[in-house]
Amino acid sequence: AQKEVKPKANPMKKTTVKGSQFETPLLEFSGACAGCGETPYIKLLTQLFGDRMQISNATGCSSIWGASSPSTPYTKNHDGFGPAWSNSLFEDAAEHGMGMHMGAKQIRERASHTLKQLLDLDVDAKIKETADAWFADYENGEKSRALSDDLIAALSDYSGDNAEAKKYIESILDLKDYLMKRSSWIIGGDGWAYDIGYGGLDHVLASGEDINVFVLDTEIYSNTGGQASKSTPLGAIAEFAAGGKPVKKKDLGLMATTYGYVYVGQIAMGANQAHTLRVIAEAEAYNGPSIIIAYAPCISHGIRGGLTISQTREKDAVETGYWHLWNFDPRKAEKGENPFTLTSKPPTRDYREFLEKEVRYTSLKRKYDQEKVDEIYAKSAEAAKERYENYIRLSEAKYGDEE
């Protein structure tokens, strides 16, 4: 009897903080480290788009907790729909995800072409009505499931004797799983996005295709033992950076904005839930490439207090100016508005306060005298300040009609 009871309809808009939590999560019991900073983001993605998601997951922590044989934390809703998940290697996850996206897109276009041929015939009014509605919102992912279901029902109910129409209907129903617009995602960590898979990632973003990238930024190669990546900030201790990383963190998000037609967002759930929801919703709705970079505290950081405070650490990161919240929306540029929006306020707490609560920074004291540690901390703070000041310049720049 319990299986026959369907969840109640969401009484709120699911792209709001409260409304999103009325949606059934399609990620459960992941087996990740307790308090992991990555899983809350993916859980949220499945609540928003899970019944129509297809995911190419780069190898890394998210592929280990995402599919440790023989189980997977990804599940399905009461209608039997859930994320379609696949894993590829560090070096080709973006290309793999692009292939998944293009394959589904081509099959959907084939179904669309066949449907147009069907409409040229004398078909039922119900088929024409549902087909017209389907075409009208062809690129609308949110409406896609219901419109596709209506179209499938109308085609299945066809009782005419037109042999050609039957042939077209049969061909379309053979492709019915592709009538709905899929939400294509490529998910991976900073080791993949900033380093090993960057060439493929750049290819995907440059393509102009409607595909989404989600980077779980732990600022370290988490799964392979804590090696430094190009995302690791100046001064942090990691494998291959035992004396503290000597150079600045790569600004992957800002690099992506230079294309001009890529939606880019940098988020931290624990710091600003509303901003997180807005950026994710806007990125997915944008008919073009998008990349979201999410700050994810990791057990490798050596957080004093442990991962029980991972969400608080995200808040700390933003309030001290260690991490910044912003987004770049190309649709604003089309209206003559500045596409860069800086959500982070000026730091309200001491930058050093953030560093002092993580072993990856305090371990510097075991290697150097206090004067040297102070110097490294100061350089790290200056690098973060420079980045924030650059974001301010971008957000205040006159653009298009504003000039």
Roles of regions detected by a PLM:
Residues 1-47, 53-54, 63, 71, ...:
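Flanking helices and flexible, charged tails adjoining ferredoxin-like Fe-S electron-transfer domains
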Residues 17-32, 88-99, 107-123, 178-180, ...:
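Conserved thiamine diphosphate
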Residues 19-50, 128-187, 192-196, 202:
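Cofactor-pocket helix-loop regions in the catalytic cores of large enzyme subunits
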Residues 38, 44-52, 58, 67, ...:
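C-terminal extensions of enzymes
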Residues 39, 44, 48, 52, ...:
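Generic, well-ordered alpha-helical scaffold segments in large soluble proteins
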Residues 65-66, 75, 165-166, 171-290, ...:
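Thiamine diphosphate
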Residues 70-83, 276-371, 376-379, 389-394, ...:
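Glycine/aspartate-rich loop-and-adjacent alpha/beta segment that forms the canonical ThDP
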Residues 90-164, 365:
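N-terminal leader/propeptide and maturation segments of large enzyme subunits in energy/redox metabolism
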